[in-house]
């Protein structure tokens, strides 16, 4: 995964689709549709890759 990729949080489906903003070490900053900006510990949570719905 890298900045710009779309992901979902496996235990927070209500957060919606997120886009990775930055990755510094194991800290991943993701901007989620319904939760805003969240910093995830990549050592604890394995984000699930996804794609935005076609328009």
Sequence positions of predicted segments:
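Residue-level detector of flexible, active-site-proximal loop/helix-junction positions
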Residues: 14, 27
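Short coil-to-beta transition motif at edge beta-strands of beta-rich domains
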Residues: 1-12
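SH3/SH3-like beta-barrel fold
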Residues: 28-32
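Glycine-centered tight beta-turn/hairpin loop motif at sheet-sheet or coil-to-beta transitions
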Residues: 13, 33-35
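Intrinsically disordered, low-complexity, charged/polar segments
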Residues: 36-55
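A short, compositionally biased
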Residues: 1-3, 23-26
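Short beta-strand-centered aromatic/proline hotspots
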Residues: 16-23
């Amino acid at each position: 995964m890298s900045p710009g990729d779309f992901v979902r949080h496996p235990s927070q489906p209500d957060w919606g689709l997120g886009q990775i903003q930055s990755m510094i070490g194991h800290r991943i900053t993701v901007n989620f549709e319904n939760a805003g900006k969240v910093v995830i510990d990549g050592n604890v949570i394995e984000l699930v890759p996804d794609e935005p719905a076609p328009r």
